[in-house]
Amino acid sequence: MNISEAAKLVGLSTKQIRDYEKMGLIKPAVRSLSGYRNYGESDLERLHFIRHSRNVGFSLHQIAQLLALQDNPKRSCREVKVLTAQHIATLNQQIEQLQKMVQKLQHWHDSCQGNDNPECLILNGLNG
């Protein structure tokens, strides 16, 4: 199947697929006589894996690590669990930071009278 069909099937753009190929996340596609990329079932499975990994926030570097583990028949599930635990910790830190941002913005928003007065507590807060 060509790159457009593969992209549509796995929910990625053709550019993403080309980029993943350049990064080595997927093997270079077999080319047709006319030079078009052709993708097989194993390519689609790998692209699905990449998309699912991106959907849960793994970086491309982390995905490369996960793919290397997946490709290694002697892998240890422990290694995968460690990578996942690290990612969960990072996500929890990001959630904490976002919650602090929301609290600060909510405080400014609640303090703002929202009237025609030029004095704005939100802008004052943003000015430090």
UniProtKB/Swiss-Prot annotation:
It is found in: Cytoplasm. Residues 4-23 bind DNA. Pfam families: MerR, MerR-DNA-bind. The keyword DNA-binding applies. It comes from the Bacteria. InterPro entries: CueR, DNA-bd_dom_put_sf, MerR-type_HTH_dom, MerR_fam, Tscrpt_reg_MerR_DNA-bd. Keywords: Activator, Cytoplasm, DNA-binding, Transcription, Transcription regulation. GO terms for molecular function: copper ion binding; DNA binding; DNA-binding transcription factor activity. SMART domains: HTH_MERR. It contains a N-terminal DNA binding region and a C-terminal metal binding region. This is Probable heavy metal-dependent transcriptional regulator HI_0293. It comes from Haemophilus influenzae (strain ATCC 51907 / DSM 11121 / KW20 / Rd). The lineage of its organism: Bacteria, Pseudomonadati, Pseudomonadota, Gammaproteobacteria, Pasteurellales.
